[in-house]
From Swiss-Prot:
Protein name per its UniProtKB record: Tetraacyldisaccharide 4'-kinase
Pfam families: LpxK (PF02606)
Gene designation per UniProt: lpxK
Keyword Lipid biosynthesis included in the entry's annotation: yes
Species whose genome carries this gene: Syntrophobacter fumaroxidans (strain DSM 10017 / MPOB)
Reactions mediated catalytically: a lipid A disaccharide + ATP = a lipid IVA + ADP + H(+)
An individual GO BP term: lipid A biosynthetic process
EC number: 2.7.1.130
GO molecular function, a single term: ATP binding
Keyword annotations: ATP-binding, Kinase, Lipid A biosynthesis, Lipid biosynthesis, Lipid metabolism, Nucleotide-binding, Transferase
Free-text function comment from the UniProt entry: Transfers the gamma-phosphate of ATP to the 4'-position of a tetraacyldisaccharide 1-phosphate intermediate (termed DS-1-P) to form tetraacyldisaccharide 1,4'-bis-phosphate (lipid IVA).
Length: 381
C-alpha cells in the first residue's frame, strides 16, 4: 500500500514542495541538468557561494583560536541529515567511559536565546528546545550529566565548558565549516548511498564546500551503510581521491520504540502491521518514513514538515484528524521532533530508539580514536 505523504499544512506545504524539488535537483545525475537562463543563474550563484566560502575560510586562518582542551569535530560536507547527532552521542559516551571529561558544543540552530550557556538536562522540553534549539535539548536529555553548551561562537562556549565543567575534551556538533576554532580531530560524515549528490556546491547542489576539501578531514564515516554495493562504490571513490584517509562504515539501528518520549519501551515485533500516521520536520523525512515501512508498520499517512519545524495548533489538529480518518493506532515521530512538542502530544507519540552501529568496523574505529587521542589524556582533578 502506497503511503500518502502530506507536505506539511497550510503555508508550510509550499515550503516543503519547494524543498522536495530542490532535493530532486541536488540528487539528480549532473548530466541530466538541462541548460537555460534559470540554470545558468543558479550556476553563477553557486560559483559566487563557493568564492565567498573560500574567502571566509582563508580569512579565518588568521584569526583561528585554540581551546585548552582536545577538540573533536563532527560534521558533514553536504546539507541535510547524515546522522551527526547519533555519532555525537556515541562519541560523548565513548570518551566519557574512557575517563575523559566531555562537553558537547552546539550552535543551537533556531534558538530564541543568544548568549552562550549550558543546556539544562531536565525541565519542560518544548521550552528548552525553543530557548536552546531542538538538537541541543535532545543531546542534553540523552547525555544527562555530560554537559551540552550552546553558542554561536564555539570558542566562547568552549571556554565556558572548560571553566564551568572542567571539560578536557569537547565535541563540536556540526563543526566542519566552523573555521574560527582549531580542532585536533575532524570527523566528516557522508551518506554511503549518495555522498555528493550532483557534485555541485550550494545552491545548485547539496555540498557546503567542494569534495576536495575532504582533505582536511582526519577520517570519514559513511552513514546509512546498508547496501554493500553502495558502500563498496563509495569506498573505492574515496580511496582513489584520498588514498591515506581512514574510512569507516556505520548504519543506524532501530532498537525499538518508546511510548512517549523517554517512556516505556515498545518491542519492534508489536509494531508490525499496526496502522499508523507519522510526521517529521527533519532534513530528509522520506528516509524516516521509508524506515517505518521497512519495519512493516502499516503507514497510512505521513506529514513532511520543514526542517526544525515547531508544530502549530493547526498542524496538531491535522495530525489527529488523520489518525481518526485512517483508523490509526499509532502516531509516530522522530526524537528531534518530539522534543519540540507540547507535553500532551509528546506523551502520546511513539518515538524510535535509534543508535549508530559500526558493525565490523567498530574495533578499528575505536583503535583509531584511541590512537588519535593518545598523549592528550585527561587532566587531574
Amino acid at each position: 500500500m502506497q503511503t500518502s505523504i502530506i507536505l506539511g499544512t497550510g503555508r508550510f506545504q509550499a515550503i516543503r514542495r519547494l524543498s522536495a524539488r530542490v532535493r530532486r535537483l541536488w540528487y539528480s545525475a549532473p548530466e541530466t541538468l538541462r541548460g537555460g537562463p534559470l540554470l545558468s543563474a543558479i550556476k553563477l550563484t553557486s560559483m559566487t557561494y563557493r568564492a565567498g566560502f573560500e574567502m571566509d575560510r582563508r580569512r579565518s586562518r588568521f584569526r583561528r583560536r585554540r581551546l585548552p582542551a582536545y577538540v573533536v569535530s563532527v560534521g558533514n560536507l553536504a546539507v541535510g541529515g547524515t546522522g551527526k547527532t547519533p555519532l555525537t552521542l556515541w562519541l560523548a559516551r565513548y570518551f566519557k567511559n574512557g575517563g575523559r571529561r566531555v562537553a558537547v558544543l552546539s550552535r543551537g540552530y533556531g534558538r530564541s536565546g543568544s548568549a552562550p550557556g549550558r543546556v539544562p538536562s531536565s525541565g519542560e522540553l518544548s521550552v528548552l528546545a525553543l530557548e536552546y534549539g531542538d538538537e541541543p535539548a535532545m543531546l542534553a536529555l540523552e547525555l544527562g550529566d555530560t554537559p551540552v553548551y550552546v553558542g554561536k561562537h564555539r570558542w566562547e562556549s568552549g571556554i565556558l565548558a572548560i571553566e564551568s565543567s572542567r571539560a578536557d575534551l569537547v565535541i563540536l556538533d556540526d563543526g566542519f565549516q566552523h573555521h574560527a576554532l582549531e580542532r585536533d580531530l575532524d570527523l566528516v560524515l557522508l551518506d554511503a548511498s549518495n555522498p555528493f549528490g550532483n557534485g555541485f556546491t550550494l545552491p545548485l547542489g547539496p555540498l557546503r564546500e567542494p569534495k576536495a576539501h575532504l582533505a582536511r578531514a582526519h577520517a570519514i564515516v559513511l552513514t546509512r551503510a546498508v547496501e554493500p554495493e553502495s558502500v563498496a562504490r563509495t569506498r573505492a571513490q574515496l580511496d582513489k581521491a584520498f588514498p591515506d584517509k581512514p574510512v569507516f562504515a556505520a548504519q543506524h539501528i532501530l532498537r525499538g520504540f518508546h511510548a512517549g518520549l523517554g517512556g516505556a519501551v515498545v518491542p519492534l515485533r508489536s509494531m508490525v502491521a499496526r496502522p499508523a500516521v507519522a510526521f517529521a520536520g527533519i532534513a530528509d523525512p522520506k528516509s524516516f518514513f521509508s524506515l517505518l515501512e521497512a519495519l512493516e508498520i502499516d503507514l497510512r499517512m505521513a506529514f513532511a514538515f520543514p526542517d526544525h519545524h515547531r508544530p502549530t495548533a493547526r498542524d496538531t489538529a491535522a495530525l489527529f484528524d488523520a489518525v481518526r480518518a485512517c483508523s490509526a493506532d499509532l502516531l509516530i515521530t522522530t526524537q528531534k521532533d518530539a522534543v519540540r512538542l507540547p507535553g500532551f502530544l509528546r506523551r502520546v507519540v511513539c518515538v524510535p530508539d535509534l543508535e549508530i552501529d559500526f558493525g565490523e568496523d567498530e574495533t578499528r574505529f575505536r583503535r583509531f580514536l584511541d590512537r588519535e587521542t593518545r598523549g592528550r589524556q585527561a587532566m587531574p582533578e
